[in-house]
Amino acid sequence: MIDLSPLVRRLAGTPLATWSQGLQAQLEAKLEKGHGDLDRWRGALESLPKLTPSQVDLVDGLRLDCDCDDATRAQMHQALMGLSPWRKGPFDLFGVHVDTEWRSDWKWSRVGPHLDLKGKRVLDVGCGNGYYQWRMLGAGADMVIGVDPNWLFFCQFQAVQQYLPELPAWHLPFALEELPANLEGFDTVFSMGVFYHRRSPIEHLLALKDCLVKGGELVLETLVIEGDENQVLVPEDRYAQMRNVWFLPSVPALERWLRRAGFSDVHCVDVSVTSVEEQRSTEWMRYQSLGDFLDPNDHGKTVEGLPAPRRATLLARK
């Protein structure tokens, strides 16, 4: 059982105290429903070697290390491979390099310098396997709660968390919609790689705003297109082979949407075209990746003939 009492204690005396009281029961109800592969993934977690890191780096990457032999490293490799595919990372765990599909460290190097997370209570919506949560702690966050309903990501987070049990990071297998309305308890809320999967983008912005304290900061990272404030791409069907992509606005359009949703001090801090070096198939993620989803003769287009992935990071205040 995952004991959330440290989280409840951490949130005592904060605007999130009332919410925290029901989290253990909510988590256990979700675990009761479970997932068909959950037992297999739990088996992988249980086979991880029992180690205590003597070196922890969450600032320049995500690296844990200690003195261990080749047999222990082989055990670590096999257990972590049992939690494949690994999407976000990379992770360096006791001499095992988990070369994930995404070079999420590249994204963090673009986003992180624009943020002040020192002492902040942070929510990461659609947190994946928690890679960014650890980097947020490395940047000085007081505590980080991630929410993502994907059970594999939940188990991948537990794989790292079992070696860092004292650190104030928690992964809850919940969707944003399962959080109460008007939570208003986080200093910083992240939504990275989620917005374009939402059928109702303004509703998503309002839900994110609901999670923030007054004056809190939103970090929004999403797919965009080039154009003016009236330009928005709605794919006819798939986008880069993804069925669940709905709205790709231009940066000026997205800035307008944020202002319309009641945010202020809206500004874009980064726009980057995603390269096949940043997102690709690896030993740890053997399925198709970005290179398979782009026009082989023109990487400026997807296989559907739409503009290739371009991602922007915007900051805004409640």
Swiss-Prot record:
<dbReference type="GO" id="GO:0002098">
    <property type="term" value="P:tRNA wobble uridine modification"/>
</dbReference>
<protein>
    <recommendedName>
        <fullName>tRNA U34 carboxymethyltransferase</fullName>
        <ecNumber>2.5.1.-</ecNumber>
    </recommendedName>
</protein>
<comment type="subunit">
    <text>Homotetramer.</text>
</comment>
<comment type="similarity">
    <text>Belongs to the class I-like SAM-binding methyltransferase superfamily. CmoB family.</text>
</comment>
<dbReference type="GO" id="GO:0008168">
    <property type="term" value="F:methyltransferase activity"/>
</dbReference>
<feature type="binding site">
    <location>
        <position position="196"/>
    </location>
    <ligand>
        <name>carboxy-S-adenosyl-L-methionine</name>
    </ligand>
</feature>
<feature type="binding site">
    <location>
        <position position="192"/>
    </location>
    <ligand>
        <name>carboxy-S-adenosyl-L-methionine</name>
    </ligand>
</feature>
<keyword id="KW-0819">tRNA processing</keyword>
<dbReference type="InterPro" id="IPR029063">
    <property type="entry name" value="SAM-dependent_MTases_sf"/>
</dbReference>
<feature type="binding site">
    <location>
        <begin position="176"/>
        <end position="177"/>
    </location>
    <ligand>
        <name>carboxy-S-adenosyl-L-methionine</name>
    </ligand>
</feature>
<dbReference type="InterPro" id="IPR010017">
    <property type="entry name" value="CmoB"/>
</dbReference>
<dbReference type="InterPro" id="IPR027555">
    <property type="entry name" value="Mo5U34_MeTrfas-like"/>
</dbReference>
<feature type="binding site">
    <location>
        <position position="107"/>
    </location>
    <ligand>
        <name>carboxy-S-adenosyl-L-methionine</name>
    </ligand>
</feature>
<feature type="binding site">
    <location>
        <position position="126"/>
    </location>
    <ligand>
        <name>carboxy-S-adenosyl-L-methionine</name>
    </ligand>
</feature>
<dbReference type="Pfam" id="PF08003">
    <property type="entry name" value="Methyltransf_9"/>
</dbReference>
<comment type="function">
    <text>Catalyzes carboxymethyl transfer from carboxy-S-adenosyl-L-methionine (Cx-SAM) to 5-hydroxyuridine (ho5U) to form 5-carboxymethoxyuridine (cmo5U) at position 34 in tRNAs.</text>
</comment>
<feature type="binding site">
    <location>
        <position position="88"/>
    </location>
    <ligand>
        <name>carboxy-S-adenosyl-L-methionine</name>
    </ligand>
</feature>
<feature type="binding site">
    <location>
        <position position="102"/>
    </location>
    <ligand>
        <name>carboxy-S-adenosyl-L-methionine</name>
    </ligand>
</feature>
<feature type="binding site">
    <location>
        <position position="311"/>
    </location>
    <ligand>
        <name>carboxy-S-adenosyl-L-methionine</name>
    </ligand>
</feature>
<keyword id="KW-0808">Transferase</keyword>
<dbReference type="GO" id="GO:0016765">
    <property type="term" value="F:transferase activity, transferring alkyl or aryl (other than methyl) groups"/>
</dbReference>
